[in-house]
């Protein structure tokens, strides 16, 4: 089964001025990210504003990215939604549309027990073939539900196509616990610590910032693959710098504005991201 690894971009969802999904801009963004060396694409997640998209809009995004990527990068569609029925529909659609796999966030807003969490993923797992990979997605600060190590272990034992997790909370002890699960792929959303997380044993990061500035993230991963720790340390400073730069105002509008400025030639004047271009220029001058 294919996996998420390395630099996995949590893609923004571009919109037209009328508020529709901008398919042309999404095509262009997908091409730009692949041309800059990212390993995997992860649309329709938190950064992709999943809660602002209808089921049909999410299907449009999935189909567009899968088609534009054309097998050049692993495409895992995030399919978690507010209702189980919508989640099920999106998982089945992603499989039928040719995705390499899916991610599914925990149930959101209303609390669930560990047993209910396990049953939820068992149902999702049963909708697709056993060889179609599924990643859990734990972001407790947003979902209101936390996925414990013991629950993740139970899910992987019961669901052979659940092969890993995206964890987006900066709890390093919990990260180490996930890494103890046999044959379990762990990726982290704390992209500021990409280099450190690779050293801990994570397979990569799922990063929104890498959707704006993929180059330093790709450089960190390439240095890691070649065991060049000094180069890795140098590049991680740019990763941290860009991550801080993009954390201006609310994270989704900030990333969307920065991304459209850089890749689509548009600028959202209502979002203060002016320093993004300055840092981009300095990085290109030095590398």
PLM feature spans:
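A general structural signal for well-ordered alpha-helical segments in protein cores
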Residues: 26, 58, 62, 87, ...
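Short glycine/serine/threonine-biased micro-segments
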Residues: 4, 8, 43-46, 76-78, ...
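Active-site beta->alpha loop and helix N-cap motifs at the rims of alpha/beta catalytic domains
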Residues: 2-9, 13-144, 154
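C-terminal alpha-helical cap/extension of soluble enzyme domains
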Residues: 6-14, 32, 36-37, 199-202, ...
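Short, conserved catalytic or adaptor-binding loops enriched in Gly and charged residues
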Residues: 1, 155, 262-265
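Catalytic alpha/beta core domains of metabolic enzymes, predominantly
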Residues: 127-132, 139-247
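Basic, gly/Ser/Thr/Pro-rich low-complexity segments located predominantly at protein N termini
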Residues: 11, 24, 50-53, 85, ...
